Amino acid sequence: MKAPITRMGGKSKLRKTIIEMIPEHTCYAEIFFGAGWVYFGKEPSKVEIINDIDKELINLFKMIKYHAPEIERQLEFEFSSRDVFEEYKNYNLENLTEINRSIRFLYLISQSFAGKGSTYGYGTTTKPSPQIFYKNVLDEVKKRLRNTYVENLSFEKIIEKYDRPHTFFFCDPPYWKTAGYGNEFGEKEHLLLRDMLKNIKGKFLLTINDHSQVREWYKGFNFKEVRVNYSVSRQEDARGKYGELIITNY
C-alpha cells in the first residue's frame, strides 16, 4: 500500500530494494518513520514499532489508529485552497485537541509543496491532492497500524528500549549536510547513531546520501550503492539522479 502522506526524504523510490534486503526478524523497529513508505510497503512483522521525533507526525498516526472516522468526517467538506492552508498554518496548537492537531497536520502536509507543510503547493500541470477529502481513505492505514506500537522518542531511546538479537532496525535519518528537515540532526547526532548501531545485538539497515564523510563513519559495514531520481524542486536544474548508500551490519 502507498504511504498516506509525503515527507522530505521519503523512500518511495527505494522501498522495493530495501524490502528485498530485510533479513529474518521477529521485531521490526523503524526509528525515523517519516511517511513510512517501507513500513506500509512490506508484509507485517510479528512485532512492529514506528517512531519519529516529530510530535505532530506521530500524533497524526496515533489519531488515525484510534480516530480515523472522525478525522475523515471533519475533512470531508474541506477543499484545496491557499486561504484554508494559511488558516490551518496559523492555528495555535495549544488550543487544539489531538484530533484537530492531526487534521491540521494532515491538511498542511498533503496540500504543501514537497510535503513540507510550509508553502502551499500549486502547479500548472498537476491537480491538487484531493485524497484526504475522500471517505474511507484512512481505513487501510488504520488497519495497518492496528498491531503496531507508535512511539515519539529520540532514536537512542528507541534503540536502547527495543534492541534484541531478533530485532531489525530500519534507519532513515536526516541526510548529511542536506537542508529541509524539520529537526536538527548534525554531526553529533550522526556519530551517536553510528556508535549505537555498532554495538546493537540486532540487525540494522540504514539509508543515507552517498558522502565521503558518511563512508568514513561507517567503514567496516556493508555498503550498497544506489542511484535515485528526485524531483522535489521547482527548478529543473535541481532535479536528477543522486547517489545514496544502503548500509547494513549483515
PLM segments and residue spans:
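SAM cofactor-binding core of SAM-dependent methyltransferases
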Residues: 20, 24-92
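SAM-dependent nucleic-acid methyltransferase catalytic core
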Residues: 1-13, 21, 65-170, 174-180, ...
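Short loop/helix-cap segments at secondary-structure boundaries that form the rim of catalytic
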Residues: 39-44, 160-164, 213-220
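Short, polar loop motifs at secondary-structure junctions
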Residues: 33-37, 136-138, 208-212
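Short, acidic/turn-prone active-site loops that include or flank metal/cofactor-
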Residues: 53-56, 175-176, 227-233
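Conserved proline-anchored active-site loop of SAM-dependent methyltransferases
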Residues: 18, 28-42, 50-54, 109-113, ...
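Long, positively charged, glycine-interspersed low-complexity recognition regions
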Residues: 186-250
